[in-house]
Amino acid sequence: MKLLSKIMIIALATSMLQACNGPGGMNKQGTGTLLGGAGGALLGSQFGKGTGQLVGVGVGALLGAVLGGQIGAGMDEQDRRLAELTSQRALETAPSGSNVEWRNPDNGNYGYVTPNKTYRNSTGQYCREYTQTVVIGGKQQKAYGNACRQPDGQWQVVN
């Protein structure tokens, strides 16, 4: 199953957990911790075999939960929407090495996506390496990844 599909399942499961939490749902930090932990476990499972893979899952879940909680504590839904739209635009149109910025005027949070190397994967899809930087409450955090262009024109994170 592709990584983005797994992420969508995790997001759906998190939404369901929030619904079970009663009126108001879970706070942003709780959501970030859940998503970060699940995403970290998913990423950690991509490395090693046997016991090494289990260690990767555990370490990934722990680091993802910590980072996700920190980011989620400050990012709201508008921040996430702006970051996603900017990511799609940057990966599709921006030259390698250029920053494409988003900014939430309501809370001052901002970030940028820097697309880097463009390449074709084994199935012929165009893919790009990228760096995503977010500044939440004055604290900067970076993430690195790869995304591939889907037939519908959307970019899908692959790791």
Curated annotation (Swiss-Prot):
Membrane topology note: Lipid-anchor
InterPro entries, sorted: Anti_2, Gly_zipper_2TM_dom, Surface_antigen_Rickettsia
Region forming the signal peptide: 1-19
Entry keyword Lipoprotein: yes
Domain of life of the source: Bacteria
Lipidation (N-palmitoyl cysteine): C20
Subcellular location field: Cell outer membrane
Gene Ontology CC entries for this record: cell outer membrane
Keyword set, alphabetical order: Cell outer membrane, Lipoprotein, Membrane, Palmitate, Signal
Keyword Transcription regulation: no
Lipid-modified sites (S-diacylglycerol cysteine): C20
Family that this chain belongs to: Belongs to the rickettsiale 17 kDa surface antigen family.
Identification of the protein by name: 17 kDa surface antigen
Gene: omp
